[in-house]
Structures are given as structure tokens and as C-alpha cells.
């Protein structure tokens, strides 16, 4: 019997401010073949075609490399998907969402691979995009998209539940060995989170991530997170270092530790209040592995967006004289 030829799938993009819509596109792309290659555009090429991304190159590479559906990352992939690159990597399928992506000249970015007959569409994820996230952050009008006691959007909760079920099917690692726990709100998922989770996973054999729901997050940050609990869970589920996700309290006690069979608690790099672990000090272990993205935070990202907008406005003013 002839051996099965591995089908390589190519999916490229900016993957700016990585969210569960990106993850879902990569999940669907992986399902089209056996091996998924993710091409990530550089900030230079993105800026030439559509404007400066919020996240820098290395930050976007780190997050995409941390996605469980991705087998290989090609850095600085061209904005217009080239047949030469497809042939170089032995790709048989090119996948992208069912929307048309145009370059700065108005040309379809996938025109070359469409002509080759290897282009496949995947469904876009409802209600989420980088633009949507930026809009939520800038407007700060959370009352318009969060309702109900726990802050979940009642309109979209059924859709999110279906996605959670699909994402869950990719998380099947057996719980054994040394169990590590890390918690936080993981809002605006970024390279700092990914690096922190990678380091924590390296401290044991199985990583449980505790996510703080919307109301808990509001209690200790004084504002709702930008993304709802289910939205944040979806993005975490796509991270290859995460084995299990639970909704966890802000104050982690010994009963919680015993119930989940946790051996080690690893505070996230951005944990500001370590006193909440006072009742379980004997299992708290700080990793001193370097997190080169420890400067990232929601505030830092917001400041970038404001700065990028000002740069854009200034360029437009010079261009139009207005």
C-alpha cells in the first residue's frame, strides 16, 4: 500500500492582536490537511498595504507559534501570497476566510493561488476582529456589548458555546505527572501571556489555567475586560501550552488546590497582588525564566493604539491639507 502523502496547508495573515477568530480560522485550515504552515506578514509589509499593526513582529510571531493548530510559522511572509513560496514549502492547499483581501493596488491578494486552483475558503468567525477589539477598547462603552449578571453577551452565548465545544475537542492531553496552575484574566491575549504560559508548562507535565470571569475581573481592576469570559476562554483554548481551563476565584485557597490536584501554582508575569496566594504559599513557585515580553499590558496596548491613530491622523492631514 502506498504511503499517505502529507497534505500541507498554508494560511497567512497579519494576526494582529491575536483573538479566537484568528484561532478558529487556523483550526479550520488545519482540518483541510495534515500539516499547517502559518505565514505571518511583517509590520513593514502590512504598513505598506493597510497601515501599521498594533503588535510588533516578534510579538505576533510568538503568539502564532503558540497556537496549537499551527505546525510551522513562516516569518515575514509576503502580503500577496506568492506561488513561488507555495511551491518552496510543498503546499497543496491555501486557506483564508471568506472575505476578499485586497492589496494597496486593489488586487486580490490570493489571485495567484486562485488561478492555481488550490485556494479554499474557511468561515469567518462571527462578532470578532482586530477592528472590533480596537473599537471596544477605544469606545470603552462596555454596556453596549456586555449584559446579564456575568457579563456574557446573551445574543452570542450560544454561538460561543458551539465554538467552545469545537475548540475543546483539540484539548485531549491526559492529566498526569506534575500539575501546574496559573491564573489571570488573560484579556487582550498577547505574547507576554503566551511566554508566561510556555514557561509555566515547562515547570511540570500538565497546565491548568484559571480564568477570572467578567465580574471577578471588574472587582479587582475596577472595569470589565474588553473580551468576555467565553471569548477569553476560546483564545486560551487555542494555546498549545494549555491543557485545561477552569473559571477560578481571585483568592485561591487550599480547597481549590486539592479539588484540581494542583502541585504547583505559578503566578503569571503580570500578577500584581501576590497576597492572594498567602493561604497556599507552600505550593507557590516563582519561575525565574526570562519573559522577554513582560512589558506588555492592556494599558501598553491601548497607548500604542492611540499613538498609531495619531500618526495616521497626522499623515492624513499632511496628505489632504486639512
Curated annotation (Swiss-Prot):
One annotated GO molecular function: ethanolamine-phosphate cytidylyltransferase activity
Entries under InterPro entries matching the protein: Cyt_trans-like, Ect1/PCYT2, Rossmann-like_a/b/a_fold
Catalyzed reactions: phosphoethanolamine + CTP + H(+) = CDP-ethanolamine + diphosphate
GO biological process: phosphatidylethanolamine biosynthetic process
Transmembrane segments: none
Tagged with keyword Transferase: yes
Enzyme class: transferase
Cellular-component GO terms for this entry: cytoplasm
Keyword list, A-Z: Lipid biosynthesis, Lipid metabolism, Nucleotidyltransferase, Phospholipid biosynthesis, Phospholipid metabolism, Transferase
Enzyme Commission number: 2.7.7.14
Signal peptide: none
Pathway: Phospholipid metabolism; phosphatidylethanolamine biosynthesis; phosphatidylethanolamine from ethanolamine: step 2/3
Listed SUPFAM superfamilies: Nucleotidylyl transferase
Keyword Nucleotidyltransferase on entry: yes
NCBIfam families per the UniProt record, alphabetical: cyt_tran_rel
Family: Belongs to the cytidylyltransferase family.
Listed name of the protein: Probable ethanolamine-phosphate cytidylyltransferase
Organism annotation: Encephalitozoon cuniculi (strain GB-M1)
Lineage: Eukaryota, Fungi, Fungi incertae sedis, Microsporidia, Unikaryonidae
Amino acid at each position: 500500500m502506498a504511503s499517505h502523502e502529507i497534505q500541507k496547508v498554508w494560511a497567512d495573515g497579519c494576526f494582529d492582536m491575536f483573538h479566537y477568530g484568528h484561532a478558529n480560522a487556523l483550526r479550520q485550515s488545519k482540518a483541510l490537511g495534515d500539516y499547517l504552515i502559518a505565514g505571518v506578514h511583517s509590520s513593514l509589509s502590512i504598513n505598506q498595504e493597510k497601515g501599521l499593526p498594533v503588535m510588533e513582529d516578534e510579538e505576533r510571531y510568538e503568539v502564532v507559534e503558540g497556537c496549537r493548530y499551527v505546525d510551522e510559522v513562516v516569518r515575514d511572509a509576503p502580503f500577496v501570497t506568492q506561488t513561488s513560496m507555495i511551491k518552496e514549502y510543498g503546499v497543496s492547499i491555501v486557506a483564508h476566510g471568506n472575505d476578499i483581501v485586497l492589496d494597496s493596488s486593489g488586487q486580490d491578494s490570493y489571485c495567484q493561488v486562485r488561478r492555481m486552483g488550490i485556494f479554499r475558503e474557511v468561515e469567518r468567525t462571527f462578532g470578532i476582529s482586530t477592528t472590533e477589539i480596537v473599537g471596544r477598547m477605544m469606545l470603552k462603552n462596555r454596556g453596549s456589548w456586555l449584559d446579564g449578571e456575568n457579563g456574557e453577551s446573551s445574543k452570542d452565548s450560544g454561538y460561543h458555546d458551539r465554538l467552545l465545544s469545537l475548540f475543546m475537542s483539540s484539548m485531549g492531553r491526559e492529566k498526569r505527572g506534575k500539575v501546574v496552575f496559573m491564573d489571570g484574566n488573560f484579556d487582550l491575549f498577547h505574547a507576554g501571556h503566551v511566554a508566561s504560559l510556555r514557561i509555566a508548562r515547562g515547570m511540570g507535565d500538565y497546565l491548568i489555567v484559571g480564568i477570572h470571569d467578567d465580574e471577578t475581573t471588574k472587582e479587582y481592576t475596577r472595569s470589565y475586560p474588553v473580551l468576555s469570559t467565553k471569548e477569553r476562554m476560546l483564545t486560551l483554548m487555542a494555546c498549545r501550552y494549555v491543557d485545561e481551563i477552569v473559571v477560578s476565584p481571585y483568592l485561591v485557597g487550599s480547597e481549590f488546590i486539592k479539588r484540581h490536584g494542583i502541585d504547583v501554582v505559578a503566578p503569571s508575569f503580570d500578577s500584581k497582588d501576590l497576597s492572594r496566594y498567602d493561604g497556599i504559599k507552600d505550593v507557590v513557585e516563582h519561575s525565574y525564566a526570562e519573559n522577554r515580553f513582560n512589558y506588555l499590558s492592556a494599558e501598553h496596548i491601548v497607548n500604542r493604539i492611540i499613538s498609531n491613530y495619531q500618526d495616521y491622523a497626522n499623515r492624513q492631514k499632511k496628505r489632504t491639507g486639512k
